[in-house]
């Protein structure tokens, strides 16, 4: 009889699988990676809803004192004996789980997706708590994070794997209708540099639509100053956001300088739509776009450079279309949701991912 690996996924968030599946089937929402992974691994999933429903006094106390991520880690640790492998979707869950697994003699394997371990409050768990001893595989999305893990946190390189993040290539896909030639758009919330983008289009014959929001951030992001007449700011559903991408001649992702791969979800969604993406090249955002090939990079906080890049892209629609087509090819070859699921599932089961993210920008 073949051995079956019993897997558990600990996922940040509150998910309704039935509603999300219906929305994806009706082409109203992209597929959710957590549930695609659960299907691929035949895994159980615990999320914040399970924390809310937990009867364990310790889990409830942890939730009150430290928040839902730490409580979810504790809930996973309480059930660890039922599983051979655990996947945590971020260090907010993975670090406290690893700390708790240090007390378990016969623990399951633990694969953790590491988003950003640069902050001191996270690094201290490696230097003092040595939680890395209970994390068998680290998956990261950026070269900056890969180097941080190996060079700064002293995690053995063989336990660190950089993979491409993803967009659902079925939902985010090129539309046949031509874009509106004077329309550009931007989207997202975390560490966005919208003031620089707004200044870049001020007074220009360009319409800018900003979809300021994130599925993972509850608080609304509001403009800090009055907007020029050619700029509109609002929140969009995923369905309406896709329509905005499709209508736009160029897509822009302005980012504040940082070490994290901020904006990658938005960039990949736009690329999957076959769009020419202009993005800020930060310390953490270096791995996906190849300047002039499948996207355009601009320096941080430079409205003049950003304006020049936007105007050039709008004035040269054939070049913009070429870059957009290359962007879609990049997604299909490297960053689809299906490839992401294959890689993460393989890592969780203890084997190397089939096609590690290519280091195109190096």
Predicted region positions:
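Acidic anion/phosphate-binding donor-loop and adjacent secondary structure
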Residues: 122-123, 147-151, 166-181, 195, ...
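Conserved donor-binding/catalytic core segment of Leloir-type glycosyltransferases
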Residues: 176-192, 197-209
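Nucleotide-activated donor-binding/catalytic signature segment of Leloir-type glycosyltransferases, i.e.
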Residues: 212, 219-245
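Acidic donor-binding loop of glycosyltransferase active sites
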Residues: 245-260, 275
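Nucleotide-sugar-dependent
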Residues: 253-269, 281-287
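Conserved acidic donor-binding segment of nucleotide-sugar-dependent glycosyltransferases
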Residues: 291-292, 296-303, 312-318
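A short, well-ordered alpha-helix in the C-terminal region of glycosyltransferases
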Residues: 312, 319-333, 340-346
């Amino acid at each position: 009889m073949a051995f079956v690996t019993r897997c558990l996924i600990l996922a940040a968030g509150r998910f309704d699988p039935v509603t999300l599946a219906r929305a994806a089937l009706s082409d109203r929402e992209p597929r959710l990676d957590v549930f695609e992974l659960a299907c691929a691994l035949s895994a159980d999933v615990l999320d914040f809803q399970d924390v809310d429903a937990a009867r364990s006094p310790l889990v409830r106390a942890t939730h009150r004192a430290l928040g839902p991520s730490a409580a979810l880690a504790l809930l996973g640790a309480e059930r660890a004996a039922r599983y051979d492998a655990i996947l945590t979707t971020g260090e907010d869950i993975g670090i406290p789980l690893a700390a708790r697994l240090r007390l378990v003699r016969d623990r399951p394997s633990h694969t953790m997706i590491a988003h950003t371990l640069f902050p001191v409050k996270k690094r201290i768990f490696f230097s003092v708590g040595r939680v890395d001893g209970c994390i068998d595989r680290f998956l990261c999305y950026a070269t900056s994070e890969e180097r941080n893990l190996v060079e700064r946190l002293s995690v053995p390189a063989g336990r660190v794997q950089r993979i491409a993040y993803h967009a659902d290539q079925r939902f985010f896909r090129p539309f046949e209708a031509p874009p509106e030639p004077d329309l550009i758009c931007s989207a997202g919330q975390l560490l966005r540099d919208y003031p620089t983008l707004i200044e870049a289009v001020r007074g220009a014959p360009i319409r800018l639509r900003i979809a300021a929001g994130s599925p993972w951030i509850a608080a609304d992001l509001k403009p800090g100053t009055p907007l020029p007449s050619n700029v509109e700011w609002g929140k969009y559903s995923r369905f309406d956001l896709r329509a905005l991408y499709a209508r736009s001649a160029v897509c822009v992702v302005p980012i504040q300088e940082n070490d994290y791969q901020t904006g990658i979800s938005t960039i990949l969604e736009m690329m999957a739509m076959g769009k020419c993406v202009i993005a800020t090249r930060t310390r953490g955002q270096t791995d996906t776009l190849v300047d002039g090939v499948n996207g355009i990079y601009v320096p941080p906080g430079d409205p003049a450079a950003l304006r020049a890049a936007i105007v050039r892209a709008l004035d040269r629609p054939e070049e913009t279309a070429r870059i957009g087509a290359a962007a879609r090819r990049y997604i299909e070859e490297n960053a689809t949701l299906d490839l992401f699921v294959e890689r993460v599932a393989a890592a969780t089961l203890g084997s190397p991912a089939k096609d590690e993210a290519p280091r195109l920008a190096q």
